[in-house]
């Protein structure tokens, strides 16, 4: 008996917590074991109870009565050793609070051990049978998912536009955009509360969806988590972003009502959250963002440009030395050199000694502001006076580093050099060319820059520039005003010649480019008979050669005063006044009606006799009689153009404009013949003219700007 007692198991009772809210006291709790007792069924060795424990011999069978709630369903109880699996020993329910359990303790163990009393709910029975049907779970999940998607869509549509963007649309948008902006502008006042309400609704819907999917998946966490994440990502995030991103402005005004409803439903929570969000969004943030964009910190193109400059070196964009405009240090700054500098269009010019690679100085165009070409100042004098520093860079320097050097104001032009260690001897610096700030900017914008001094037809560009809508202006040919050695020697300086040509072509209508071309006019002004001087005799102020024009005396010439003073006497009253440089007289002497002047200068099909000057044009019948007197008061330098010279200039201009055809071969002007023609006609006119050989003046002084 003692061995049997020693081998008997001790039955302890234990309360098992069931899965579906047993401890929390849900509405439909599972079965719980509150107590038990042995039932006497009359069988031998039915066991006994001692010290609150039921004892029996191995392989004995006895009957237990269980007490507790929940035994009326299909639950069943069992007794098993610790760590053992479930046993198929079903209890017989005897009511809502009682059940009978027949037990048989097997004799596998040779030592006493304890057994556990537990209750199990079968799959498909008990609380599982009380779960919602699948269609209800599906509808609930769809509703929660729609709520999450709606909250996210309202957030992306009604609250997507910032106040600054709404104001821009209201002021400069289309009619539909302005109407939508006017409806959205008041809603931005409670944007913080609306954002808090929508975030709360979206969070609640997503959390409830996860719990519902957990119940639907049989309380398995992994399928519930994966399913909830996938549905929220696709339906709750991607779809609202796609729809709101395309129709933001159309959906935003229509979604205001739903946004207000969300705020009302969650007002106790949305109001403090909205205040917190508005406090976090500092008013100065917009201004700081604008300043950041203005500085280029938020501009993606800034980083792109820097990346391009880091990948390129100076050697890739430099101008080769043989293509650079440079000056020798021994050059004399006469009119020809200054004209070539102006013609080049450069503001910084390198100066070299002996060979072009030996750059020793830099000449700025502004250094020549006070240089007179007639002084023939040596270039070395100017460069030594200003002594501009030279800026050297190596050929492998990155363009971003060169740009920083230029930005610091050192120079806008750098000399590119490299270390030449080829061959025998010591290494030396070899000059490759020049690089300017313009070259770096062209690399950034990926296009060629043509300034006002450049002509696309004369410039070798690296890239094709944008098409020019307006035609390029003709370059000024300053070299035309330089008198070459083989031309006639004239007493007028190149600067004064340039000023005279500009003044006549732009201020005096009879010498305008529509009548006389600029080249023909320049050729005319260089003629010795046109450039004249009058020496003033102090001892005889009323000398005959002092009178340029006399009242009622016929003349056939035009006069422009270049230097000196004259006295003009007008009318019978004898009104007198003085005039100086760049006053002109005798315009009417050139415009006396004639066959040549009556025909348009630009005509391409003139009549032959219209182009032939009448030999009698210098007679009194076509002479001009001024009603004023012009007398020299000092030494004069003047331009005197006779009518025959003017007619020859008209013929030369027409010959240039006429097409080359057999009918117009007699109108072609042979180079150099114009000067001879002017001289011959002037000599002929001098023999037959009754005017004074002195100097002439304008028909009516009232037409003279000086008068």
From Swiss-Prot:
Its main location: membrane. CDD domains: CBS_pair_CorC_HlyC_assoc. Glycans are attached at residue 73. Residues 318-379, 386-452 form the CBS domain. It is found in: Cell membrane. One of its GO terms (molecular function) is transmembrane transporter activity. Residues 678-691 have a biased composition (Polar residues). InterPro entries: ACDP, CBS_dom, CBS_dom_sf, CNNM, Ion_transp-like_CBS. PANTHER family: METAL TRANSPORTER CNNM, METAL TRANSPORTER CNNM3. Probable metal transporter. Shares weak sequence similarity with the cyclin family, hence its name. However, it has no cyclin-like function in vivo. This is Metal transporter CNNM3. It comes from Homo sapiens. The gene is CNNM3.
